[in-house]
Amino acid sequence: MDPLQLLQPLEAEIKGTKLKAHWDSGATITCVPQAFLEEEVPIKNIWIKTIHGEKEQPVYYLTFKIQGRKVEAEVISSPYDYILVSPSDIPWLMKKPLQLTTLVPLQEYEERLLKQTMLTGSYKEKLQSLFLKYDALWQHWENQVGHRRIKPHHIATGTVNPRPQKQYPINPKAKASIQTVINDLLKQGVLIQQNSIMNTPVYPVPKPDGKWRMVLDYREVNKTIPLIAAQNQHSAGILSSIFRGKYKTTLDLSNGFWAHSITPESYWLTAFTWLGQQYCWTRLPQGFLNSPALFTADVVDLLKEVPNVQVYVDDIYISHDDPREHLEQLEKVFSLLLNAGYVVSLKKSEIAQHEVEFLGFNITKEGRGLTETFKQKLLNITPPRDLKQLQSILGLLNFARNFIPNFSELVKPLYNIIATANGKYITWTTDNSQQLQNIISMLNSAENLEERNPEVRLIMKVNTSPSAGYIRFYNEFAKRPIMYLNYVYTKAEVKFTNTEKLLTTIHKGLIKALDLGMGQEILVYSPIVSMTKIQKTPLPERKALPIRWITWMSYLEDPRIQFHYDKTLPELQQVPTVTDDIIAKIKHPSEFSMVFYTDGSAIKHPNVNKSHNAGMGIAQVQFKPEFTVINTWSIPLGDHTAQLAEVAAVEFACKKALKIDGPVLIVTDSFYVAESVNKELPYWQSNGFFNNKKKPLKHVSKWKSIADCIQLKPDIIIIHEKGHQPTASTFHTEGNNLADKLATQGSYVVNINTTPSLDAELDQLLQGQYPKGFPKHYQYQLENGQVMVTRPNGKRIIPPKSDRPQIILQAHNIAHTGRDSTFLKVSSKYWWPNLRKDVVKVIRQCKQCLVTNAATLAAPPILRPERPVKPFDKFFIDYIGPLPPSNGYLHVLVVVDSMTGFVWLYPTKAPSTSATVKALNMLTSIAVPKVIHSDQGAAFTSATFADWAKNKGIQLEFSTPYHPQSSGKVERKNSDIKRLLTKLLVGRPAKWYDLLPVVQLALNNSYSPSSKYTPHQLLFGIDSNTPFANSDTLDLSREEELSLLQEIRSSLYLPSTPPASIRAWSPSVGQLVQERVARPASLRPRWHKPTPVLEVINPRAVVILDHLGNRRTVSVDNLKLTAYQKDGTPNESAAVVAMEKDE
C-alpha cells in the first residue's frame, strides 16, 4: 500500500459491527472502543505510556477484521468510536517485497509440472492460470516462511525445567549454510536475538545437494514437555484410506512448522547458540515434541471440507477421477492455504498425474510400490566402513521390509555385525557384501503391494520354518498381498515345537492384523488342523511358558478372528521345509500298540570277590487310554554295571517289540542309551561299531542286537524320560517308577528265590545310607522281601515309592474317607516319611471327592456398595417376567435409582435391547445417569445397547453370573413388585398392566426401615399427595423444601459391612478354587474341577478359567476353596494335570 493511503480511514469490523480504523505508526498495541470489550475477559494487565503519563490497563485478546482480513491481536480499550491499529498487528498492509539470500527457479518448476501433468487441452491451460493467480502461495526463496494467522501456541513444561546443553563441535563445512539459514529467518522474524537460561545444541545434517540442514537436538526439552493427546495418524492407516482417482496431486508445504507462532513466554525454551550469539525461535521449532501434531491438526482442520484430501505433516494428497473436479478442488485448496498464510514448494510437488510419490511410496490405482528415487538410493549403497554407515544402510533397507517375504532372515547376518562391533569398527566380509547385494536386488525387483480395502475381510496366511515365521496379508478375494511379515525366532523360541512356533507366528501376525482389520473379521489360515484341539496339548509336550499359552488361547475367544486349516498354502511353498523336532514326532502313548518302560540298576555285590550285582526291570504297558500293565520282568544280571543293565533292558524290550504289530514306544531313563540309539547308532553301524577313538564299543553285542531289531521293525521309537520324578508329573512317571522298582528288585537277587520289594531309596537305606526323612535311631532290615522299620509303636512295612500312592488310594477308596481316617488306616500297617502329606496329595486328586464335597470355608462378607451422593448418579435395571399376558405385554423393565430407591416401571413385550433403549430414552429425557448396573442378560450386553450408552456418556456395570446379590437393590424391588401384584391380582392375574402405575406409586411412597424415609421424600424432599402423607411438607416454600431435602440426604448413612466369619477365606492369585455347577441334577457333582485364580478384582470377585477354558469373572459366593491347600497355596501342577486328563 502507498504510504499516503495510510492517512485514509481503513474499513474495520468487530462482532458484525462495521466501523473505521486508523493506522497509528506510534501505537505499540491496538486500541478498540470500550463497548466491544464489556463481555471480554482480560488476559493480563500492562502499563501504557501516553502524553498524560503511565497508566495500568487490562489487555484483551480479540478477533476483528481490517480491510476484510481477519486479525487476532492483543488490544486495550479506548474512549473513541474508531480503532487505532498498531502496525505490528497488520504487517501485510505495508508489506515490502521479500528479499532473502537464494532465489528458487520457480519458472522451471512450473514448466516441469505443466510438462508432466496428465491434464490436456483447456484443463492444462487452466492449471497454468492457477500458477499465475496464486503466485503469492508459491515459495520464491529458499528458507521462505509463511505466517499462519492463528492464536500463538504456548509451550507448557512440567514442574522441572530442562537443563541447558552444551553445543556440539560443528563441521566447518556446515557453517556457511547454517549462517545463511539464520540470516534469512532473522529477516522474516522467525528468529530473534535473545538471551535465555536454556540452550539447545545445533546439529547440522548434510543434504544430498551439498548444503546443510539446520537441526536442533531438543531431546532434553522434550523430556519436560507433556505430550498432547492428539497425535498424527499412522502412515499405514492413511495409505489404506486414500482415494485413488485417475488424477493425483501431492503438495509440499514449505517450512510449515515455522509458519506457526508461539507465545513470547515460550521463547526461552527454544534458545540455541550460534557463533557466540544466542537466538530464540518465535515460531514452532523443528524437533520440538508436539510440533508435528499441532501443525498437522491445523492443516487437517483447514482442509476438512475438501473431498478426497489426506494430510500427513507437511504433505498433502488430493485425488479425483474427473479433471474438472480435480482442478476446482485444487483451486479451493490453493485459496485456503494462501489465506491461511502457508507457502507451497513446487519443487517437491506433483500435480494431476496418474502416479505420484506420497509418504515415500509410489501411489498407483492398484496399490503402492517402491519409488524410483528409493531404488536409486539402494543402487548407490556401498559397503559400510564403520558402524554408523552400517546402521544407516539398515535403516534404509528397513523402510521396505514389507516388500520381501523373508526380509528379517536376510538382514539378520547384517544385524549380527552390530552386536560384534568393536566401538565404531566393524568386521565386513565378502559374504556380507554378497548378502547386501542380494537384498538390494530383491527389493529392486519387488512387486507392488495392494492397499487395505476396509470394505472386505482381512486374510492372514501363516507358515513356519525351523528358524522363522512367515506371514502374508491379503484383502479377501484378492491375489496381490497387502504386506509381508517375517519374524526370526529367539533362542528360546527356536526350541519350541512346530505347533508352538506357528502359534508364536500367529500371535505376531495378529498384533498387526488387528490394526489392519479396520473393524472387519480376520481370517487366519495356517497348517494347524484344529485350533481348539491344541488346547488339550499335554503339559509335557509344551515347551513354551504357560503365559504364552494363555495369550495364544485367548485368540480363540476373540469374535473378530476365525481360524482355518490350509494344508497347501501355495503362496508359501518356497519356504524351507519344516523339520520336526523330537517332541513333535512323539505321539501320545495311547497311539502306540505297546509301550515298554526299561531301567537298569546295580548294587555292591555281597561277595567280596565280585564288584557288582546288576538287575534290569521291564514293564510292558498299554494306554487304553488309562495306564494298564500287561506284563513285568525283574531279571538279575549278575556281576555287571548299571550301564550294561540299561542297555540290556532296552535290548530285551526291542526283542519283545518284534512280536507286536504296530508302532512300539520304548522309554528309558538313561540319557546315554536314548541318545546313542537316536543319533550315534547309524554311525556305529557304518564304521563297524567303533567309537570316536576307533576302539570297540562296550557291550557291542547288545548294540548290534538293538540295531538289528530297529532295522527289522522301523516303527520302534526309543525316547529318554527323566527318572525319579514326582507322581503324575508326566505320562511316563508311573511306568518309569515301576521299571525302577523292578530293576532294583532284580539287582538284589543273588542266590535266593524271593524277589524283594525294593527301589533305589530303600536300597540306600539297607546299605546304611539314610535318605532324607529316615531317622537314624530306627532299625531297618529286610524281612521276607520287604523292608521293615522298628519304631516305638511297633513294626511297619516301608513300601517302595512307586507303590505308596496305590496303597493310599486303596485305603481311601473303601469309603472315600477324609484325611485323618485314611491316614489312620494306612499307618496301621505301613510307615514312610511324610506319610500324612502323601495322604493329602492323593486325596486331593480324587475327582469324586473334589466335585461332590461341600465347601468347608465360608465366603468373605458381602461388600456394601457406596451410596451415590446425588440422585440419577446410578441406576439399577432388570426385567421381571415372563408374566401372564396382559394387554399384549409379558415383561416389566424395572429401573431403580441407587441413591433414593425411586422406581420406574415400563411394560414391554419382550426383554430385548430395543425395548430397553426405548424405555430408557423416555427416562433419560428427565436426567441422564452416570452409571447403569445390570445383570449379564442379552438385552444389556448387546453391542447396540453399548453403543447407545456410549452416545449418552453412560458407563455400564455388570454383576457376576449366578450372583443376584450384586444387583441387590433391583432384585429386592422385583420381589416387592411381584408380591404386591400377587396380592392385588388375586383371581385375575392377567390384569397386572393396569395396576403398574398403582404399584409404582405405592413403592415410591413406602417407608424404608433403614433410612426412615420414602423414595419420594429422598428424591423431591416432600411427600406426594397420597394418604398418610405429611401435610406439613406440602405447604413449604421452595427454599424450605430444598433445605429439608439437604437435611434428609445428609442424615443418610451407609450400613457397615458385616464382620467376617472365622471360617471365611480370602481369595488370592494362584489359589485352586472350584466353581459351583449352575443347576446340578440329583446325584450329580455340585462343583467343577479345580482351577487357579488368575486375578483378584476385589474381595468378592475374581477371574478364573472356567471348565470350558474361558476366562470369566465370578463371585466368590459361587466358588469353594479346593480342600487341603496350606495357607491358600495351590496344589502341585501334576495333580491338576492328572485331573484334567481324567476329566
From Swiss-Prot:
- Domain Reverse transcriptase residues, every copy: 186-363
Record domain Integrase catalytic: where: 864-1023
User: Which Cys residues form disulphide pairs?
Assistant: none
As to how many cofactors bind and how, the note says: Binds 2 magnesium ions for reverse transcriptase polymerase activity.
Write down the chemical reaction(s) this protein catalyses. Endonucleolytic cleavage to 5'-phosphomonoester; DNA(n) + a 2'-deoxyribonucleoside 5'-triphosphate = DNA(n+1) + diphosphate
What's an example GO BP annotation here? viral genome integration into host DNA
* Modifications made to the protein after synthesis: Specific enzymatic cleavages in vivo by viral protease yield mature proteins. The protease is not cleaved off from Pol. Since cleavage efficiency is not optimal for all sites, long and active p65Pro-RT, p87Pro-RT-RNaseH and even some Pr125Pol are detected in infected cells.
**Database matches in Pfam families:** Integrase_H2C2, RNase_H, rve, RVT_1, SH3_11, Spuma_A9PTase
The cofactor(s) it depends on are:
Mg(2+)
Which residues does the UniProt site feature Cleavage point to? Answer: 596-597, 751-752
Q: Where does Mg(2+) 3 bind?
A: 873, 935
GO CC, alphabetical: host cell; host cell cytoplasm; host cell nucleus; virion component
EC number from the UniProt entry? 2.7.7.49, 2.7.7.7, 3.1.26.4, 3.4.23.-
- Residues of the active site are 24 (for protease activity)
Task: Report the residue ranges that make up the Peptidase A9 domain in this protein.
Answer: 1-143
Cite the binding residues for Mg(2+) 2: 599, 646, 669, 740
Q: Which residues bind Mg(2+) 1?
A: 252, 314-315
* Entry superkingdom: Viruses
Keyword list, A-Z: Aspartyl protease, DNA integration, DNA recombination, DNA-directed DNA polymerase, Endonuclease, Host cytoplasm, Host nucleus, Hydrolase, Magnesium, Metal-binding, Multifunctional enzyme, Nuclease, Nucleotidyltransferase, Protease, RNA-binding, RNA-directed DNA polymerase, Transferase, Viral genome integration, Viral penetration into host nucleus, Virion, Virus entry into host cell
Q: What InterPro entries does this protein map onto? A: DNA/RNA_pol_sf, Integrase_cat-core, Integrase_H2C2, Peptidase_aspartic_dom_sf, Retrovirus_Pol_polyprotein, Rev_trsase/Diguanyl_cyclase, RNaseH-like_sf, RNaseH_domain
Example of a GO MF term: RNA-directed DNA polymerase activity
> What does the annotation say about its assembly with partners?
The protease is a homodimer, whose active site consists of two apposed aspartic acid residues.
Q: Please explain the role this protein plays, according to its UniProt record.
A: The aspartyl protease activity mediates proteolytic cleavages of Gag and Pol polyproteins. The reverse transcriptase (RT) activity converts the viral RNA genome into dsDNA in the cytoplasm, shortly after virus entry into the cell (early reverse transcription) or after proviral DNA transcription (late reverse transcription). RT consists of a DNA polymerase activity that can copy either DNA or RNA templates, and a ribonuclease H (RNase H) activity that cleaves the RNA strand of RNA-DNA heteroduplexes in a partially processive 3' to 5' endonucleasic mode.
Cite the domain annotation text.
The reverse transcriptase/ribonuclease H (RT) is structured in five subdomains: finger, palm, thumb, connection and RNase H. Within the palm subdomain, the 'primer grip' region is thought to be involved in the positioning of the primer terminus for accommodating the incoming nucleotide. The RNase H domain stabilizes the association of RT with primer-template.
Additional comment: The reverse transcriptase is an error-prone enzyme that lacks a proof-reading function. High mutations rate is a direct consequence of this characteristic. RT also displays frequent template switching leading to high recombination rate. Recombination mostly occurs between homologous regions of the two copackaged RNA genomes. If these two RNA molecules derive from different viral strains, reverse transcription will give rise to highly recombinated proviral DNAs. Foamy viruses are distinct from other retroviruses in many respects. Their protease is active as an uncleaved Pro-Pol protein. Mature particles do not include the usual processed retroviral structural protein (MA, CA and NC), but instead contain two large Gag proteins. Their functional nucleic acid appears to be either RNA or dsDNA (up to 20% of extracellular particles), because they probably proceed either to an early (before integration) or late reverse transcription (after assembly). Foamy viruses have the ability to retrotranspose intracellularly with high efficiency.
What name does the UniProt record give this protein? Pro-Pol polyprotein
The record lists the organism as: Simian foamy virus type 3 (strain LK3)
